[in-house]
Amino acid sequence: PAERICPQLDDFDTTKTYTATDGTTYSYAEYLPAEDNQKNALVIWLHGAGEGGVDPTIDLLGNEVTALAGDEFQELFKGAYVLAPQSPTMWMDDGTGAYQNGDKGSCYAESLFELIETYVKSNEDIDTNRIIIGGCSNGGYMTMEMILKHPDYFAAAYPICEAFQDQYISDEQIES
């Protein structure tokens, strides 16, 4: 039998898509924890700027997101869903298709949140008190946009080297 080139992808379903009410279609990958009759955390990974498109394996392999399905991580969370949505272009796209500095916000902000809410509702054993969102660079930007727009929805965030410029964060947003 032939060996798989990327066996670390075996635990993920990389064939999922979601079309939001605004018409935006996302490809996404998901990892489902073992069924254990318990509520499980949801960890959301948002990719960097060069990883948009329609192939979520790029997101998973680009930053070793596959480790989130590994035994060590899953044991720490006692089982966790992993959701890795892929923007059609990049999270910092304001609708022009060009990389922008963040002052206008992302054209994907509302449709991404719709995807997340729909995903949570369709997986009843997700613990809504343990929804964690993060990503690096461009994904860190969208992490910041999500937590600033929906501060009560996410339990925690891990924006890594986020591209969100401080000048666009108000004191009121920080306090919320």
Stretches found by the model and what they are:
Residues 155-176:
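The feature captures the conserved acid-bearing segment of alpha/beta-hydrolase catalytic domains
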Residues 85-86, 134, 160-161:
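Alpha/beta-hydrolase-fold catalytic nucleophile elbow
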Residues 140-151:
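Short glycine-enriched nucleophile-adjacent loop
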Residues 38-42, 78-81, 127-131, 151-156, ...:
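Loop/turn elements at helix/coil->beta-strand transitions in domains of secreted/extracellular proteins
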